[in-house]
Every structure is written in C-alpha cells, then in structure tokens.
Amino acid sequence: MICQECHERPATFHFTKVVNGEKIEVHICEQCAKENSDSYGISANQGFSIHNLLSGLLNMDSSFQNAGTQMFSHSEQISACPKCGMTFQQFRKIGRFGCSECYKTFHSNITPILRKVHSGNTVHAGKIPKRIGGNLHVRRQIDMLKKELESLIHQEEFENAAHVRDQIRLLEQSLKSTDSEEEQE
C-alpha cells in the first residue's frame, strides 16, 4: 500500500479516524507521519518502532524485570538456538527470532511475554468461517466451559461448577443432535 500523502513511499502507519460519525482510514509513510505529526497525534520527538515495542515488552516494568531475572537465567543455560545460533539476549536486543526453532528453544522465556501481550492467551485460536463453522463454535464453547469448570473446582466454587457442568452437557447434547442430523442427510 502506498502513502496517501506523498504517493511515493510504502505506507507503514494506518489510522482509522471517526469524524462526524464517518469512519475514515488513512495510510501514510513514516516520513509523512513525522512531518504531519500534529494532525495524526504522533509526538515528533518520540520515535516509534517495533523494536522499541518489543524491547518495552521484554523489560516491562520493575516487577516484571524482577520476575524476569529468574526467567531469563534459564535462557543463559540454553546458550543458543541449535538451528540458527541466536541467543535470547540477541532476541531481546533486536526484537525478532532468527528461525522457527527459536520459538521452541526459548518457549519458557517468551510465554510470559505472550501472555501479557495477548491478554492471557498463549495459544492461537484463529477464526472460524460462519458458513461452515457451526459445530466448531459449539466445540470451542465447550472447551472454554471445561477450562472454566476446572478453575471453579480448583477454587472450590462447586455451585457455580455445577451450573457450568450443566451448560457443557446441554451443548454436548445439541452437538450430538446436529451431528446425527448431518449423518442422515
């Protein structure tokens, strides 16, 4: 996508503005964003890069850093990725891994970061197409309720757990009935 201001460089900033109830999308390059920083709400003296974002996440705050000393000490035991040779310290510096094996090698180090960034989720769920995903929505809901049930039992909230268990049973019954209907067709 090309910058809407200069029509020369690739757009790296994408804004959505709502003006008088009308949604307007603006796509501009970094240079035009700096030049027109006031109109886009960007501070001209404060640069932004993905590196700064990831560095900020890796060095979140003092409580995270204190917890991170134990977390990062494990990465020093694993000196480098066996495939590409990248160390976790290098990842912290440049903000990106060298290969897919790095994710496996440094999994225990990046899990807290991912959990913080993705609101507690560390597993990609993806989207389900509406046309063909009817049963998948129900199965996902059952999986979420089962996790909630385990949590409630662990917290000894047995009355709430019984309600969740009943919801799971109802959803499983509806799933069985839709599966049997599809088999008959």
Curated annotation (Swiss-Prot):
It holds the Pfam family UVR. The gene is mcsA. Induction: Is repressed by the transcriptional regulator CtsR. Forms part of an operon with ctsR, mcsB and clpC. Disruption phenotype: Cells lacking this gene show a defect in the delocalization of competence proteins. Residues 139-174 form the UVR domain. Activates the phosphorylation activity of the protein-arginine kinase McsB. Is required for the delocalization of competence proteins from the cell poles. SUPFAM superfamilies: C-terminal UvrC-binding domain of UvrB. The keyword Acyltransferase does not apply. InterPro entries: UVR_dom (IPR001943), UVR_dom_sf (IPR036876), YacH (IPR025542). This is Protein-arginine kinase activator protein. It comes from the Bacteria. Interacts with McsB. Phosphorylated on Arg residues by McsB. Keywords: Phosphoprotein. Transmembrane segments: none annotated. The modification Phosphoarginine is found at residues 115, 169. One of its GO terms (biological process) is stress response to cadmium ion. The keyword Phosphoprotein applies. One of its GO terms (molecular function) is cadmium ion binding.
